[in-house]
Amino acid sequence: MALYRAMMADWREAFKNPDLPFYLVQIAGVAWAGEGADYWRGVRDAQQALMNEEKNVYMTVSYDLSEPDNIHPAKKQPMGERLAAAALANTYGKDVNWRCPTVSSVEIVEDKLILNCDHVSSWHTCDGGEIEGFFFVDRNGKREKASLTARGTSLVCDISENTSAEYIEYSVLNYSYTNLLNEHNLPLTPFKSKF
């Protein structure tokens, strides 16, 4: 991301606008390096850090639009709408919902793992099916599909039988199918958390 930071600094200087906003699309999933690999996670993490650390940098998520063999997914309109909403809210001051949901905290209550989330009032899946894209990960990196249910703004799963799992992750792999959206049809931001 050093090059991205340098580009932003150069453009802000060239346009004589130290607050010039930047809008970026978090890299989509692609199976080039293998469906189970997580090479692109580092890129996504760096993009997230860029948004969190730099002023006037806003990011939208595209993982839900991913295609296994195309780094530039064909579904351009939803991405354009997400970027437009971000610009309307942040550059033009409009009251528009643009933030993708994020996991704000992870807690264990009895035998349940609870993911508390921000920027969501309700959840649904784009295909009407069960929530897809979550995995438990043990200390050796072995992944096992995690089954979650929506409960209000939180996501809940039973961990009573997953005694070796140390992490839960979502949209971390180079490519995996995901279908979870908030009430504004915005996808959950990729994450990995220890519990």
Language-model features, listed with the residues they occupy:
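Catalytic cores of secreted or luminal carbohydrate-active enzymes
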Residues: 44-132
